[in-house]
From Swiss-Prot:
Gene name, Swiss-Prot/TrEMBL: queA
GO biological process entries: queuosine biosynthetic process; tRNA wobble guanine modification
Keywords: Cytoplasm, Queuosine biosynthesis, S-adenosyl-L-methionine, Transferase
Protein localization: Cytoplasm
Organism: Bacillus cereus (strain ZK / E33L)
Gene Ontology cellular-component terms listed: cytoplasm
Pathways per UniProt: tRNA modification; tRNA-queuosine biosynthesis
Highest taxon, organism lineage: Bacteria
E.C. numbers: 2.4.99.17
Name of the protein described by the UniProt record: S-adenosylmethionine:tRNA ribosyltransferase-isomerase
Amino acid sequence: MDINLFDFHLPEELIAQVPLEERETSRLMVLDRETGDIEHKHFTDILSYLHEGDCLVLNETKVMPARLQGVKEDTGAHIEVLLLKQEEGDKWETLVKPAKRVKEGTVISFGEGKLKATCTGTADQGGRQLEFSYDGIFYEILDELGEMPLPPYIKETLEDRDRYQTVYAKEIGSAAAPTAGLHFTEELLEKLKQKGVELAFITLHVGLGTFRPVSADTIEEHHMHAEYYHMSEETAALLNRVKENGGRIITVGTTSTRTLETIATDHDGKLCAASGWTDIFMYPGYEFKAIDGLITNFHLPKSTLIMLVSAFANRDNVLHAYNEAVKEKYRFFSFGDAMFVASHAKMGNK
């Protein structure tokens, strides 16, 4: 399948550079995955579309301040490091810039030597393996020295780093935020619970795949970078109970979707407690096994994320919705507006 089938025209001014002042004031496009019908709403209207007995699945990963500015110890040359994945102990898979300056044995110093890293080898597709040394607690030092790893299309400085975290972020380990969750406030989640909507939590640590465009000409040639996921017995039991009682499972974001679909694929359609690494790649032709609806942001042209949404809601429906979003001047990408995708039969207000 040609990658260009997932292209669309996006004016640069529609790429949201900063978060809205209030999380829940973003807009919400409601897309019927079967008919392609569209409604234009506000995010707080999600209350009208989720019913008693439904379950929202939220990714409680927490973004690390994973971007570090350092210098080579021998020359003083500036090096930028992006932490991607903890491999074991103090060894990490990273992206470094400029990569050509970092070879095996190179030592990089951060914060006047408070944190040091030695390159121990190369990683996939141009990355570097670094081993860190320090006195104290690594994540406390990272919190002091690191910057939030905003995507390259965001040029503005983030004034409040909490705005690139969900309000329920808990398990540190991501190199990017699960952005569909950024729209929820604690008050909105409480209103959903009062309505009888269940909240279930999983973890998927967002890694390298988020920053890597599809370089292949056809979808089938592209390989996803593996990301760590975890679902507890408690969450699995809740999801199975919801399904047995006829409720819908609505994933918040592509990361929650990938977690549930990975587990269902690996366990004959069943949802159970599981941990591991997933490189699942969903594009048109994929048959969904676990979810009934999806809340997601508006994604980049030709990205694996728009392919996932197209697998769930039909490519023609999704591209029509995206063109409508451009026409209506929705805000795109990480700090942008949201889309709720589900089937018409259960879409309306109750």
